[in-house]
Amino acid sequence: MILFLLYATTTVFLVAGIIYFASKRPGYSHVKQTISELGEDNAPDSRIVNMGLFLPVGLILILIGLLSRNDNIVSGLAICLGVGYFISALFPCDAGSPLFGSGKQTIHNIGGFIEYGGGIYFLHKGSHL
């Protein structure tokens, strides 16, 4: 129950943070842009988005994954999501989050692959139980 509450609180914190920082960014579109762009290089609030939103969310999700050892699906999903947020916080994307860019963008994209690829894998694996 405690892990569920921690996960739910983290989800609310993340969603509220995304909505808040997007509202402070004129022209930002939740449909046309990635959330990584809220913390991209030279974005107005990039430091707080990366260190105050993405980093704590990533660390908490990794913690949830480590504490969920008895459930491989939840554990794997939480760790993959957490690693993605953790990497994105430490390696913010280039402006516009291009597919190809600087070395930092490449590391950022690898974090995204772990997050989305791992997320899809564990959700698919969980759907077959």
Model-derived regions, located:
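Hydrophobic, aromatic-enriched alpha-helical segments typical of multi-pass transmembrane helices
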Residues: 1-28, 42-129
